[in-house]
């Protein structure tokens, strides 16, 4: 009897232990099947950002200790895109190095899915589902086994890797903190449903850079539609400054589309370098502005920072979440640092006769307290008498507070008999300029009350008016505000 009671207690304790283990989920490795994971997770080091020194292996606890994984710091997970060579591209170590320079104590993990990424594009695109699943299982393992907070996890995916990051975020048991999509791939994803591509629901915050969205939506290298909480389109999301369009077209004509990977690389990959720029040049953040269309942005109608209408590009983006996707635009330089300074210019052209000219070339020069920027070219699609025109210009240097500007109307590159018989000229009294970066507005006056602006003639000079008008009539101000808000709203 004593033996029987003892055996009963032992059996009862065993059952109780099993129940407790099952309820607490204390053995996640028993519940997870890591055998199907083909992606590799390389924990890069600051000393060797271009080398796969140590791999973290899901299900193997000792790999975390062997690779010196920091359990108390941020973790960046970098996911590359489609590859022709089957090798890492040169941007990978550059991004790793920049992340460590900004966050020295962090963990920077590079996801290696090169074998799957080297297939024909449609095949590799389909593999993003499996890669996303691999990454999700890896993240869940870290969270469940070590109670690693997913608030410390930031996924960064380029091209196809952006969609793999989105799928991973949708599959984790708890949401990761942030996903940054670096020009997410367009083909096969432009019209895809949210579960199989990057979407705002995949993380607490999703920000996206679109740098190569040329052509029809189904043929655009980068996805055109907004897929995050904030979607930023540098230079309209089209061809990027410094990327030689003429050379690309020449190579296409000579070699066809066999080398398309190299031809589109410059603009497509610019998304990565813009993010790297935000890591390295913390003191020179690029500013983006909310706008409905790039056409409205080109007119300078969206340089407002009211109610979160402007934001930093890249790492230090302000996390603004709205009910709808927020589209933002900005201009950049051709190389690092990419920051420029945006200005809206408004001019009213007075004329005795009703004259309209199209596609007119102009030059504007700005002079300020810190520097100057001369002969900035811009083209007005239309110039008409007795009408106000607004347009966007930008400078690559910080001019400081504006003091003076010059405006010149260039001659056409072709000869026009009408210009010879009836030379065109307008009268300008004032020029209004608004800075996007400082939000300051300045009104410039002609020294003589009004200045003649003639085609091919000398530049008209305007200086800062002695008395800056506060505002127009209240009704007019409200109307102007409503018009700008219509363009800026997302």
Curated annotation (Swiss-Prot):
Q: Which residues carry this modification: 3'-nitrotyrosine?
A: 121, 191, 343
What high-level taxonomic lineage is stated for the organism?
A: Eukaryota, Metazoa, Chordata, Craniata, Vertebrata
Reported impact of residue 440 to N? No change in heparin-binding activity nor in specific enzymatic activity. Reduced heparin-binding activity and decreased specific enzymatic activity
Positions of the region Essential for determining substrate specificity?
A: 243-266
Please tell me, according to the UniProt entry, what happens when changing residue 430 to N.
Answer: Reduced heparin-binding ability and some reduction in specific enzymatic activity. Almost complete loss of heparin binding and greatly reduced specific enzymatic activity
Cystine bridges: which residues? 54-67, 243-266, 291-310, 302-305, 445-465
Species name for this entry?
Answer: Gallus gallus
Question: Partners and quaternary state?
Answer: Homodimer. Interacts with GPIHBP1 with 1:1 stoichiometry. Interacts with APOC2; the interaction activates LPL activity in the presence of lipids. Interaction with heparan sulfate proteoglycans is required to protect LPL against loss of activity. Associates with lipoprotein particles in blood plasma. Interacts with LMF1 and SEL1L; interaction with SEL1L is required to prevent aggregation of newly synthesized LPL in the endoplasmic reticulum (ER), and for normal export of LPL from the ER to the extracellular space.
Instruction: Provide the protein name.
Output: Lipoprotein lipase
Cellular component terms per the entry's GO annotation: catalytic complex; chylomicron; extracellular space; plasma membrane; very-low-density lipoprotein particle
Encoded by which gene? LPL
Spell out the reaction equation it catalyses.
Answer: a triacylglycerol + H2O = a diacylglycerol + a fatty acid + H(+); a 1,2-diacyl-sn-glycero-3-phosphocholine + H2O = a 2-acyl-sn-glycero-3-phosphocholine + a fatty acid + H(+); 1,2,3-tri-(9Z-octadecenoyl)-glycerol + H2O = di-(9Z)-octadecenoylglycerol + (9Z)-octadecenoate + H(+); 1,2-di-(9Z-octadecenoyl)-sn-glycero-3-phosphocholine + H2O = (9Z-octadecenoyl)-sn-glycero-3-phosphocholine + (9Z)-octadecenoate + H(+)
Membrane topology value: Peripheral membrane protein
According to the UniProt entry, its GO molecular function terms are:
apolipoprotein binding; calcium ion binding; heparan sulfate proteoglycan binding; heparin binding; lipoprotein lipase activity; lipoprotein particle binding; phospholipase A1 activity; protein homodimerization activity
Q: Which family does the record claim for this protein?
A: Belongs to the AB hydrolase superfamily. Lipase family.
GO BP terms: namely:
cholesterol homeostasis; chylomicron remodeling; fatty acid biosynthetic process; fatty acid metabolic process; high-density lipoprotein particle remodeling; low-density lipoprotein particle mediated signaling; positive regulation of adipose tissue development; positive regulation of chemokine production
Recorded hits in SMART domains, A to Z, give:
LH2
Enumerate the residues binding Ca(2+): 194, 197, 199, 202
Broadest EC class assigned to this enzyme: hydrolase
The entry's keywords: Calcium, Cell membrane, Chylomicron, Disulfide bond, Extracellular matrix, Glycoprotein, Heparin-binding, Hydrolase, Lipid degradation, Lipid metabolism, Membrane, Metal-binding, Nitration, Secreted, Signal, VLDL
Control of this protein's activity? Ca(2+) binding promotes protein stability and formation of the active homodimer.
Q: Where is the active site?
A: 159 (nucleophile), 183 (charge relay system), 268 (charge relay system)
Domain PLAT as annotated: residue spans = 341-464
What start and end residues bound the annotated signal peptide?
1-25
């Amino acid at each position: 009897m004593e033996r029987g009671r003892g055996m009963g207690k032992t059996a009862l304790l065993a059952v109780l232990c099993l129940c407790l283990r099952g309820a607490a989920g204390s053995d996640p490795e028993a519940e997870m099947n890591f055998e199907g994971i083909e992606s590799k997770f390389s924990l890069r080091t600051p000393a060797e950002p271009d080398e796969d020194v140590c791999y973290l292996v899901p299900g193997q606890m000792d790999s975390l200790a062997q690779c010196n994984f920091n359990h108390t710091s941020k973790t960046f997970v970098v996911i590359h895109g489609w590859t022709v060579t089957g090798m890492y591209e040169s941007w990978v170590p550059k991004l790793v190095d920049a992340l460590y320079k900004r966050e020295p104590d962090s963990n920077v993990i590079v996801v290696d899915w090169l074998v799957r990424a080297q297939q024909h594009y449609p095949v590799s695109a389909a593999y993003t589902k499996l890669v996303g699943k691999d990454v999700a299982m890896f993240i869940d393992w870290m969270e469940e086994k070590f109670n690693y907070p997913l608030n410390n996890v930031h996924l960064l995916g380029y091209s196809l890797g952006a969609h793999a990051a989105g799928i991973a975020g949708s599959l984790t048991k708890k949401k990761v903190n942030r996903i940054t999509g670096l020009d997410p791939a367009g083909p096969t994803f432009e019209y895809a449903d949210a579960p199989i591509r990057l979407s705002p629901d995949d993380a607490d915050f999703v920000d996206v850079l679109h740098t190569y969205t040329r052509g029809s939506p189904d043929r655009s290298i980068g996805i055109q539609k907004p897929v995050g909480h904030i979607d930023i389109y540098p230079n309209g999301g089209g061809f990027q400054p410094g990327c030689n369009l003429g050379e690309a077209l020449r190579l296409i004509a000579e070699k066809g589309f066999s080398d398309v990977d190299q031809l589109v690389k410059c603009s497509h990959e610019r998304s990565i370098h813009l993010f790297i720029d935000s890591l390295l040049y913390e003191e020179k953040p690029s500013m983006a502005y909310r706008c409905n269309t790039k056409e409205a942005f080109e007119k300078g109608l969206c340089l407002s920072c009211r109610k979160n209408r402007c934001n930093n590009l890249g790492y230090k983006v302000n996390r603004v979440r709205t009910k709808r996707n927020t589209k933002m635009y900005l201009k950049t330089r051709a190389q690092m640092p990419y920051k420029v300074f945006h200005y809206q210019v408004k001019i009213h052209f007075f004329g005795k006769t009703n004259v309209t000219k199209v596609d007119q070339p102009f030059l504007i020069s700005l002079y300020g307290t810190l520097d100057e920027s001369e002969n900035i070219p811009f083209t007005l699609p239309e110039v008409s008498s007795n009408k106000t025109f607004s347009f966007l210009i930008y400078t690559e240097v910080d001019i400081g507070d504006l003091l003076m500007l010059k405006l010149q109307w260039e001659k056409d590159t072709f000869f026009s008999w009408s210009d010879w018989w009836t030379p065109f000229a307008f009268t300008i009294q004032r020029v209004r300029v608004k800075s996007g970066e400082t939000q300051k507005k300045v009104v410039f006056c002609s020294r003589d009350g009004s200045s003649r602006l003639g085609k091919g003639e000398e530049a008209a000079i305007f200086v800062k008016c002695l008395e800056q008008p506060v505002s127009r009539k209240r009704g007019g101000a409200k109307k102007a505000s409503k018009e700008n808000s219509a363009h800026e709203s997302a």
